[in-house]
Amino acid sequence: MNNIDILILFFVLLYVGIAFILKVYINRLNGKNIDKLVLSDNIKIVIFVPETHVDIIIEALGKAGAGCIGCYDYCSFATKGIGRYRSLEGSSPTIGNINEFTSCEEIKIETICPRNKVAQIIRITQKVRPYETMGYDLYPMLNLSNNF
């Protein structure tokens, strides 16, 4: 197992615990059974990039198989924000200088991908990223079954 596989396993196990707690809590609130809430086959991926690289990243995500929802592909959502960091000794910052605090406009790209393609999609995206270190988040997703 590599580090990404271990991270994915951690998030799946985390989901199982959270899903159980949510089921118990919601059942107590309204007495309804939510057993039809199921773990999705997809993972939500969130990536932070400068505005200049949004199209490059979205293209890489789509080509790798991310962003498929029903009869649509290349699906994503983007929001603008401010990224903040300090580059430490030994780094090669794309924006800013070593040992200085830097703030820059970034775009947060959100999309989904099949759980079995997460590691591949992250590796492909890391090849086209502009930053030395790519910031990203992975979230397990819940869906309602068709009979709910």
Swiss-Prot record:
SUPFAM superfamilies xrefs: NIF3 (NGG1p interacting factor 3)-like
Main location: membrane
Cellular component GO terms, alphabetical: membrane
Intracellular or extracellular location(s): Membrane
Spans traversing the lipid bilayer: 6-26
Membrane-topology descriptor: Single-pass membrane protein
Lineage top rank: taxon: Viruses
Keywords noted in UniProt: Membrane, Transmembrane, Transmembrane helix
Keyword Ligase: no
PANTHER family linked to this entry: NGG1P INTERACTING FACTOR NIF3 (PTHR41774:SF1), PTHR41774
Name of this protein: Uncharacterized protein R836
